[in-house]
Amino acid sequence: MNMKKLNVTLAILVAAVMAGNAQTSVTSDIVGYSKIGAPSGTVALVPGFVKSPKFAGSATLSGQSFAVTMPAGELNQSNFSDRPNYPTHYIEITAGDYEGYAYDIVANTPTSVTAANVPSAINGQTFSVVIRPHVTLDDIASASMAEYSDAVNLINPDGSTTTRYYAAGSWIAEDFSTAAGHTVIYPGQAVLLSSGGVEIITTGVVKTTKTAVPLYAAAVNYVGPLSPSGDTKVIQLQIAPSLAVYSDGFNQFTTDGTMTTIGTYYSDGVDVLDAGFSPLPSTATDSITTNTGFALSAGADGYWIMPSPLSR
């Protein structure tokens, strides 16, 4: 039986970019675009890129505020006030024991940013960080989508579902009137895209560091690798240490629009196990398709520390 599958075309180039800090040296970011052909039906879609940083450098944490120095106007209060209900930027630690952990920015001054839910255990420490704009639903909007019909579902930490509909080049909320294109898609989060078949072009930067993807006990977690340039083998996910042994698990789906389960996996704390609780061998070819996700159930809140696609 021939099944129509998610098709992905990728273009990658290396560009020298300057993060928004005069004291930060020029670095080479890997930027590019993916052309994603999503079939009719539903797919778990993961944007494979992040956005270029506005700041890269060191920051010292005091309470919930990170001390940074950015050019005037780079990040001002309007960045937050014009986006009700959703943050526009986040600060992420890029090295050390907390590499990959990110926190939404809720306010800022010219010399600091205040973030939400920063753990008190790291107060007073200095970190290497980046500040990036969030990827949003507008970044996956496509003119090939059907207005008021094609939609995405996002699963919230409490297990509830938020639905957004495509309209007029952007997205609207469940009331079919409130603008919602600024709805955030967090790194590693999958959205459930239901459509009649669309082509989506995403652009951005390949992430070169780890990503701490939140896992919630109260929800089915739709998550997936940030890998815009190729499928990711299940044994490359490095997810086993994040799962409770023999109880937490995840399901892999087809990408033909039917979301039929084709693989179930568990953990022994070290290795990923198949549905029969046998460790996957190093030769296992089970893979997560580029720009797609899987459904994970966790018995307790935690994080999956996802490796950079460049480390595979």
Sequence positions of predicted segments:
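Autoprocessing Asn-cyclization modules and mimics
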Residues: 26-133
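Short, structured motif recognition centered on aromatic/hydrophobic residues
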Residues: 87, 91, 148-155, 187-192, ...
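Hydrophobic residues embedded in beta-strands of well-ordered beta-sheets
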Residues: 66-68, 111-113, 161, 170-172, ...
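Charged, amphipathic alpha-helical scaffolding segments
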Residues: 163-206, 271-312
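Sec-dependent, cleavable N-terminal signal peptides
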Residues: 1-24
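Catalytic cores of histone-lysine modification enzymes
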Residues: 24-58, 65, 128-159, 197-257
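Short, surface-exposed loop motifs enriched in S/T, G, D/E and P with embedded aromatic residues
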Residues: 56-63, 103-108, 162-169, 263-269
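Contiguous ligand/interfacial binding patches
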Residues: 161, 165, 241-285, 311
